[in-house]
């Protein structure tokens, strides 16, 4: 959400970052039909939502992290897919291509939006111009593939897009690059809740002091 917000800001769009990160949605003022809202919304919020509808919806993955809250996997998947169920035929959805549960849900339902299946193998030619170490991990690389697909759909300026991505340093304390040189990169991942949340970046690095 944060990198998409930064990209749209650099493109001189009127953009607001709200939801789980950023400001409360109802606190935003002076909005227009051209205002972009980048919303990080949880499955908990989606579960109870009856009127929320996004023109651009993103489902990065389906994990078992929130099963305790939703009681079972079916309830969790249904909550996530309210994003797509609330869309119309002028909306767009971006989902992980090789996720079994996501593909299964799409096959069983007739969603109205245009659905893009995204993976790192089909990143566009712009990816060759990127040199940001933040995206070295599999997880962040996957996030980047979604960003590039969304940017293409929005027809953003490619030069500004590349600059925004190359300058992105991540959220504070979450795989945040705080120093980078030829021989040393220092990454602050102190907000990690455990080994599992750091595993993606660790397995893509060498000579690690953790």
Segments predicted by a language model, with ranges:
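Nucleotide phosphate-binding/pyrophosphate-handling subdomain across enzymes
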Residues: 14, 133-210
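A conserved segment at the C-terminal end of the G1
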Residues: 1-16
């Amino acid at each position: 959400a944060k990198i998409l917000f930064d990209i749209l800001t650099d493109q001189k769009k009127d953009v607001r970052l709200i939801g789980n990160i950023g400001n409360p949605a109802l606190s935003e003022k002076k909005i227009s039909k051209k205002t972009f809202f980048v919303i990080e919304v949880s499955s908990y919020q989606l579960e109870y939502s009856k009127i929320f509808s996004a023109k651009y919806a993103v489902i990065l993955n389906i994990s078992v992290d929130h099963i305790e809250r939703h009681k079972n996997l079916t309830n969790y998947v249904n909550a996530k897919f309210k994003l797509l169920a609330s869309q119309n035929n002028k909306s767009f959805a971006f989902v992980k291509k090789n996720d079994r549960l996501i593909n299964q849900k799409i096959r069983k339902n007739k969603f109205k939006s245009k659905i893009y299946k995204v993976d790192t193998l089909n990143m566009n030619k712009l990816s060759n111009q990127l040199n940001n170490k933040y995206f070295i991990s599999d997880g962040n690389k996957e996030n980047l593939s979604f960003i590039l697909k969304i940017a293409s759909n929005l027809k953003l300026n490619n030069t500004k897009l590349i600059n925004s991505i190359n300058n992105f340093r991540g959220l504070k304390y979450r795989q945040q690059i705080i120093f980078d040189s030829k021989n040393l990169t220092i990454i602050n991942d102190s907000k990690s809740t455990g080994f599992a949340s750091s595993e993606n970046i660790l397995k893509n690095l060498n000579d690690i002091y953790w």
